[in-house]
Amino acid sequence: MHAATEQLVRIPVDTGLIEGALEWPPESQGLVLFAHGSGSSRHSPRNNHVARVLRERGLATLLVDLLTPEEDRVYATRFDIPLLTQRLLDVTDWARRQPATALLPMGYFGASTGAAAALSAAASQGAGIRAVVSRGGRPDLAPARDLARVQCPTLLLVGACDEEVLALNRCAVAHMPGPTHLTIVPGATHLFEEPGTLEAVARLAADWFAQHLPTRGAPSGAQ
């Protein structure tokens, strides 16, 4: 297997630049954009583990900090779902302009609060986003009107021991009209720190994206 190509990127937003890591294996079959939870970053070991498994399955990945360093120092900003949603949309637009990713079908992987931003962004993108996976997500933080507009296949992964978040996800399923599946990971708490649980998340996410991201092209390089 050939190694993935890695590129550190800087993406312009309204208040400056945000940074990310774009990696694509040869003949990538799709691109997954990651939205991490509050207090985390693109260096999140959990998201990077999932991203590595996705690349092994032939998918390109883009892990990005949706806030500038200055914004991230303000605690309340980490929970500003409209801002995080707009940033994810900015990243999506940027990815569609890059030769490495322009032709690839796209999906979102959101963790915790990042899942709310991923769902809201998917709602506004319509058919432009082909699939969403949420890990321990907080769909309750997304506006109800956005949940009602999510049409793409969505996989909600929640730990069996994460009782509060599990209840929130069960409620969200009832408000989402698109194909939505809630999978409970046995023995897992919110951070999926228990042996084998994060591996299960990565496998389930890879299977979901492989099923729902149709082949449309292969990358040639990024700017």
What does each model-identified segment do?
Residues 8-104, 191-196, 200-201:
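Serine-hydrolase catalytic machinery in alpha/beta-hydrolase-like enzymes
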Residues 163-168:
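Conserved alpha/beta-hydrolase "acid-adjacent" motif
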Residues 188, 196-223:
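Catalytic active-site module of serine/aspartate enzymes centered on a nucleophile-bearing elbow/loop
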Residues 176-191:
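Catalytic histidine neighborhood in serine/cysteine hydrolases
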Residues 107-110, 135:
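Short beta-strand immediately N-terminal to the catalytic nucleophile in serine-hydrolase-like folds
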Residues 127-139:
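A conserved short beta-strand
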Residues 150, 156-158:
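Short beta-strand/loop motif that positions the catalytic acidic residue
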Residues 109-118:
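Gly/Ala-rich beta-loop-alpha elbow adjacent to hydrolase catalytic centers
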